[in-house]
Amino acid sequence: MTKADQIFKANIQKIINEGSLSEQARPKYKDGRTAHSKYITGAFAEYDLAKGEFPITTLRPIPIKSAIKELFWIYQDQSNSLDVLEAKYNVHYWNEWEVDQTRTIGQRYGAVVKKHDIISKILKQLAENPWNRRNVISLWDYEAFEETKGLLPCAFQIMFDVRRVGEDLYLDASLTQRSNDILVAHHINAMQYVALQMMIAKHFGWKIGKFFYFVNNLHIYDNQFDQAQELLKRQPVASQPKLVLNVPDRTNFFDIKPDDFELQNYDPVKPQLHFDLAI
């Protein structure tokens, strides 16, 4: 069993056994019912990517291609436009969060990255001093929240650090997430930010190091407990999936494409499970 599957099953079981029930929940299902959840707080995981530990479960198929395309929309295109997301990447699931028929998600995610020129600043800082301790990407922008409606960012902060091991430099990353639907989005979000870590490492010709993942509120929605039990029953495959970025070292961050990523040794348990999303 992979480390990701061990952590996944342990967290599902912990939520079922020890979780608290939500109150005054904001999300709704499509039929208008309030989407309550059972949750735990302060979930943490550590993966050593250099040793082949990747945060993706084999217990169900994870749509990694669309997840990486979404990441490019945020950090390369630096856009909040649903038209860009659909036309360029053929990704449609963000339509559920369109703001007031604007064909945007409001001043969120990519719009905040562009507003503060975050990627250029991070790359400049790392180029000038790889060992600086100020490499923080934060999407938590109160001014933007007041400017427009929109879903507040779930994965909202990632920090980077560089370590020397022998002759090699390794890039570590720490992702902080305020809220996460473990059955649907947990491994999508984790692998998105592993991909971002890999893109920055490639930009400088560094190796990928460790990935740290902290979720403040990790939950299962009240219409997902049958799926949770099914996942606990499933036996994971033996192979360890691995995400590979097939570009030369020092490829410019903005020249990398979604198709440059390849998920190897991934043969998840099927069939896929159906989830009604909370919006």
Swiss-Prot record:
Binding site for dUMP: R133, R134, R178, S179, N180, D181, N189, H219, I220, Y221
Gene Ontology cellular component annotations, sorted alphabetically: cytosol
Pfam families registered for this protein in UniProt: Thymidylat_synt
Localization per Swiss-Prot or TrEMBL: Cytoplasm
InterPro entries per UniProt: Thymidate_synth/dCMP_Mease, Thymidate_synth/dCMP_Mease_dom, Thymidate_synth/dCMP_Mease_sf, Thymidylate_synthase, Thymidylate_synthase_AS
EC number: 2.1.1.45
Alphabetized GO MF terms: thymidylate synthase activity
Binding, (6R)-5,10-methylene-5,6,7,8-tetrahydrofolate: D181, A278
Signal peptide coordinates: none
Catalytic activity: dUMP + (6R)-5,10-methylene-5,6,7,8-tetrahydrofolate = 7,8-dihydrofolate + dTMP
Keywords: Cytoplasm, Methyltransferase, Nucleotide biosynthesis, Transferase
Major localization class: cytoplasm
Assembly: Homodimer.
HAMAP family: Thymidy_synth_bact (MF_00008)
Protein name (database record): Thymidylate synthase
UniProt source species: Streptococcus pyogenes serotype M1
Source organism phylogeny: Bacteria, Bacillati, Bacillota, Bacilli, Lactobacillales
